[in-house]
Amino acid sequence: MKVLESLSNQHKTGLIPDFAWVKDGTVTPAKKDQVAGANDGNYGANSCRLPWRLANSNDKAANQVLSKMMNFFLEESTITEGYTLAGKPLSSNKSENFSAPILYAAKKKEAYGNLVDSQSWVIQNGLSEDDYYGDTLTTLVTLQMNQK
């Protein structure tokens, strides 16, 4: 959790990169193409699951990391497919990969009701059938949201 806290504290957005390095107690985002591709050091296809994962934790530090990210997303008029850690959109496209985890986290806390409204399109539109990753995240999130 300390690594996530450190990464969250490095930017006012609280966004976490897809990959990071820990060396001698220092945490730094990976650079482009160091691990898997051009978005290694951005909030991308790997880190987009974090809101969903952190929302399932009762840990105080996890909730602080999540709150910082969610506050960033509250300010965005549209949640797009990836961001730099400073909050610059990497695309103008919406994506289930990014919206489904945010929807789940927003459902867990009343303060994020606007995100529930804006991200509900993920469920209302149904599965795309051509986006395995997005459809999988949407299905998992929907199942968990409906648990009693």
PLM region spans:
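Terminal, non-catalytic domain-edge segments
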Residues: 53, 105-121, 125-148
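Extended ligand-binding clefts on enzyme/binding-domain cores
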Residues: 1-100, 107-110, 132
